């Protein structure tokens, strides 16, 4: 030692024991950290691009905190085509999406959510309504319906056209690669779009909304037997976070 003191045999044993204990404590600490990481509950969720679900995520975080539960949530936005591809290939743990996209897929579990109110988006510069008071769907019968390009699935297009055909409207259509291009052309009064209240377009200052007499079924979906406990927790929390909105 620095003082020149020499440990007695029993002192040496105590010293060696202390060094060994310090080493073992460090090893146990690392082992505990590794185990904690392995046990961490986490989910990676896909959502359709253009959907604004921030307020719901914040409500979920409050629910988790007040209940003392832990669930790490990360989110990515995709086109419908990429969303389904990521889901099938297990690149995401689950998704929030229109139920119509999930029903045709095999080996998928899902939890129904409260349906979303559909809206018709049109430019604030659009000509006044025919009745001089308020718009109806009939006011747009001669306008173009602006749609997302149908790559892997025609379900969203069929859903929108089916609604209009039930109203006796068979519109000319134009397809786009992404939702931002649709919203831009709608704001320029080049047509109208059918969307829902989670769409960014519903809050765009250049657009107006006409509430439709239709609601879209939606769900949280995930591959069967894949991250089941975490996904079920997420699905239940997400549904609960929607309840005050209904």
Report the location of each language-model feature:
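N-terminal winged-helix
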Residues: 30, 34-68, 78-85, 229
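A ligand-binding cleft/hinge motif common to bilobed small-molecule-binding domains
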Residues: 96-106, 158, 179-208
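Short beta-strand-to-loop elements that line the ligand-binding cleft
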Residues: 70-79, 168-181
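Secondary-structure junction motif
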Residues: 55, 135, 141-167
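Flexible hinge/capping segments at coil-to-helix
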Residues: 36-37, 108-145, 229-232
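Short beta-strand-centered segments that line the small-molecule binding cleft or hinge
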Residues: 16, 58-62, 80-123, 205-210
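Alpha-helical "hinge/linker" immediately C-terminal to small N-terminal DNA-binding modules
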Residues: 6-37
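A late-sequence structural motif
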Residues: 208-246
